């Protein structure tokens, strides 16, 4: 009798867990976020960089952001740059700090920042978060989290062609 009761309880627990799991795994739906247009004078951008401008990678983002702000006719005080932000919890803290300073658009430039930026995006649905080199925006389906990643296959192809030409130059045999 005890075995039957135990088996019944376990079956009920399993079915309950299965139903809860199926209901909770509604991953095909995008999280509904109502992002309203931002008036030009209300735009405030935060930029989170792994290193400072001494790193050519980060300098590229810093210079591009400065140029974008200028081209859009935004004021200098509409951009806050945070450099030297490691791929740790400090990235999340920095993103939240930027939100608290009024930033409504936040960019991060390091692959390792992604999980921290996603967490901030989840907690701050009214702020737009952009992550360079990220890969999870299309799978996580946050309405306010976006990835920016170039199609780099062209560059890889050209690098391969250049390497092949160098081999021919060095060894003189294009036929292998």
Spell out what each predicted region is.
Residues 26-28:
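Bacterial signal peptide processing site
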Residues 65, 156-176:
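An alpha-beta-alpha
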Residues 47-48, 100-111, 128-132:
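Periplasmic-binding protein-like
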Residues 31-40, 44-64, 68-69, 81-91, ...:
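Extracytoplasmic "Venus flytrap"
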Residues 88-103:
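Short, well-structured alpha-helical segments in soluble
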Residues 21-24:
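C-terminal motif of bacterial Sec signal peptides marking the signal peptidase cleavage site
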Residues 122-149:
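Flexible loop/hinge segments that line or gate small-molecule binding clefts
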Residues 1-10:
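Positively charged n-region of N-terminal signal peptides that target proteins for export
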